[in-house]
Amino acid sequence: MAALAASIATSTAFAAKPRLSRPPARLSVSCSASSGDNNNSTATPSLSASIKTFSAALALSSVLLSSAATSPPPAAADIAGLTPCKESKAFAKREKQSVKKLNSSLKKYAPDSAPALAIQATIDKTKRRFENYGKFGLLCGSDGLPHLIVSGDQRHWGEFITPGVLFLYIAGWIGWVGRSYLIAVSGEKKPAMREIIIDVELAARIIPRGFIWPVAAYRELINGDLVVDDADIGY
């Protein structure tokens, strides 16, 4: 009886162990299956979204390339924001408006009258000015007006450097002639009257000397005659 009871207890113990081990096995299988389903369901929408994004980007690039190939390139220059005047639509429009305004004024006068001839000369001068702006490569802005480039670029020296040097030369010539005239009349009895009433004969002799004012100024600077002492200046 004791042996029979022991065998029954042993068989009961062995029979209970599989019952306890089955549920964890089933739980693990079910978890792995659900995880796989979630991954598949998540991967499918992301893949379709990537395909749609790539297709949209490809279509957009095709449209941009086709438009760039068919449309002519815009007129551009070496300075940002500026366009060569001969290629600027705003510049051509401004020229057309200027000539049109002068032509409307020309119609008010007889063909051979003095005002008509003066207006016609102005029209010719206006056309020539706009033509020169385009011929010499000036750059225009969005307003259609030429812009001077003062950055020191050698390609645009003719727009600013050359006129600037010419202006300084003319201004120096005028100043040197005036200085020479004041020095010439300073030794007279009433120099102030010579400043008010200009001696034309004396001024006519001094004016031609002013054309070499850079050389004359350098010579006086070397000799010490260009600047006077403070003691010789009257207050």
UniProtKB/Swiss-Prot annotation:
InterPro entries the record matches: PSI_PsaF (IPR003666), PSI_PsaF_sf (IPR036577)
Pfam families cross-referenced by the UniProt entry: PSI_PsaF (PF02507)
Keyword annotations: Chloroplast, Photosynthesis, Photosystem I, Plastid, Thylakoid, Transit peptide
Coiled coil (UniProt feature): none
GO biological process: photosynthesis
Domain of life: Eukaryota
Span of the transit peptide along the chain: 1-77
Cell compartments where the protein resides: Plastid, Chloroplast thylakoid lumen
Primary localisation category: plastid
Gene3D superfamilies reported in the protein's UniProt record: Photosystem I PsaF, reaction centre subunit III
A GO CC term assigned to this protein in UniProt: photosystem I reaction center
Role of this protein: Probably participates in efficiency of electron transfer from plastocyanin to P700 (or cytochrome c553 in algae and cyanobacteria). This plastocyanin-docking protein contributes to the specific association of plastocyanin to PSI.
Similarity field: Belongs to the PsaF family.
Name assigned to this protein: Photosystem I reaction center subunit III, chloroplastic
Organism: Hordeum vulgare
Gene: PSAF
